[in-house]
């Protein structure tokens, strides 16, 4: 290898083939697509993904937070980082909670609902500090105040974006699945108001009653 070799891979996820994509950055250690590994999560990045390392190579993993010790499977490798899918949590972070949303692990609308709200506020403050430093701002002598939280961190959004799709001759409605354009069929959202939930239900019934077609990205037709 020179500095690295990247083999472009096209996967049929149902086939679970074993095409391998490798990268060599140290001349000694390599990762492979499909590789199983155990990782300690030490940080959370700006996308809400947990950050860990395998042989000093950075790996990002969804649905993990600082303090988690997890088993993952590598599914993508770039020049400077890899991405892994969470298989199981071996040791939970003390800041990890069970999400109150039954759609959370499918929906792409939220990234931190498995993190305690107190820790979310700390994460947001640290993100501001990190972004300012990354932009070259000298923070010496500057006090960054703590994030001001809410008494109840739910039902606060006045705008949400939901999409329609055709599935088994039925129209489904909801947000996109995380990292895809696949619509997740939901009945409510804990971030929007209860009035918005009711309006969502009315629209769903109207679509079914009047046999309105789901939006088709190719033709531009539908709702």
Task: Mark where each language-model region is.
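Accessory RNA-recognition modules of RNA-modification enzymes
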Residues: 18, 23-223
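Short, positively charged and aromatic/hydrophobic N-terminal segments
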Residues: 5-13, 19-24
């Amino acid at each position: 290898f020179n500095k690295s070799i990247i083999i472009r891979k096209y996967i049929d996820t149902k086939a679970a083939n074993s095409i391998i994509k490798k990268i060599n950055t140290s001349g000694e250690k390599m990762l492979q697509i499909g590789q199983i590994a155990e990782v300690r999560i030490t940080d959370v990045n700006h996308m809400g993904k947990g950050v860990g390392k395998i042989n000093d190579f950075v790996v990002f993993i969804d649905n993990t937070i600082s303090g988690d010790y997890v088993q993952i499977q590598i599914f993508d490798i770039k020049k400077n980082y890899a991405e892994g899918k969470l298989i199981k949590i071996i040791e939970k972070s003390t800041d990890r909670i069970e999400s109150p949303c039954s759609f959370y692990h499918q929906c792409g609308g939220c990234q931190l609902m498995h993190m305690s709200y107190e820790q979310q506020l700390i994460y947001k403050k640290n993100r501001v500090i990190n972004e300012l430093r990354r932009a070259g701002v000298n923070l010496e002598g500057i006090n960054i105040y703590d994030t001001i939280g809410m008494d109840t961190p739910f039902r606060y959004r006045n705008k949400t974006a939901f999409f329609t799709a055709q599935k088994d001759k039925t129209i489904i409605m909801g947000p996109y699945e995380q990292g895809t354009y696949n619509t997740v069929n939901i009945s409510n959202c804990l971030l929007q108001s209860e009035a918005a939930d009711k309006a969502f239900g009315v629209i769903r019934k109207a679509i079914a009653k009047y046999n309105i077609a789901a939006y088709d990205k190719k033709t531009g037709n539908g709702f």
